């Protein structure tokens, strides 16, 4: 069972790394397209913030917007700063849509062998019960719990259904 946990958690963390890489690439392209200073650093920070479920992307869009505006200090506010910031925000939203509807469900369902709805329910309920820390730890702990249940309660019908792909 320890080996099963190790394998699934390794796959989960590789999936997170892949997700961060995808977002980092998209964010970097967006920021470089609009000439934002320190685009790579901003993209990296916002991609890392995306690891915090639901709240991280909100913090990321605020950070990216603010740093985009400060990148154009000295420029005309209405003709340069507002339009460039708006384009960056649109790009950020598109990147989030790609992440939330394409890459994240595919990566997580393949890495930890769970349905995307199952992952959503686990993260949401953990967030309600334990806050942000619960949301961050939800998937790794759920993965450990699934392996534990499969090893010790493999005859239970519900456990069989939840762990059939492990």
Task: Identify the role of each PLM range.
Residues 16, 37, 58-59, 76, ...:
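Short alpha-helix boundary/capping motifs
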Residues 81-166:
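Hydrophobic alpha-helical transmembrane segments of membrane transport and translocation systems
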Residues 69-70, 149:
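Structural signal for the C-terminal ends of transmembrane alpha-helices
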Residues 74-80:
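Intrinsically disordered, low-complexity Ser/Thr- and acidic-rich flexible linkers and loops
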Residues 1-69, 78:
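Alpha-helical transmembrane segments and their immediate interhelical loop/hinge regions
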């Amino acid at each position: 069972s320890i080996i099963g946990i190790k394998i699934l958690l390794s796959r989960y963390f590789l999936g997170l790394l892949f997700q961060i890489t995808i977002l980092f690439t998209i964010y970097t392209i967006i920021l470089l397209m609009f000439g934002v200073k320190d685009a790579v650093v901003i993209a990296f920070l916002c991609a890392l913030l995306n690891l915090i479920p639901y709240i991280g992307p909100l913090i990321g869009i605020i950070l990216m917007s603010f740093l985009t505006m400060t990148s154009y200090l000295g420029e005309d506010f209405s003709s340069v700063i507002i339009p460039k910031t708006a384009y960056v925000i649109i790009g950020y939203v598109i990147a989030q849509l790609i992440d939330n509807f394409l890459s994240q469900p595919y990566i997580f369902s393949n890495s930890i062998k769970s349905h995307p709805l199952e992952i959503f329910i686990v993260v949401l309920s953990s967030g309600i019960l334990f806050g942000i820390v619960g949301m961050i730890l939800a998937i790794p702990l759920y993965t450990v719990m699934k392996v534990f249940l499969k090893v010790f309660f493999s005859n239970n019908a519900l456990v069989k259904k939840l762990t059939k792909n492990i």
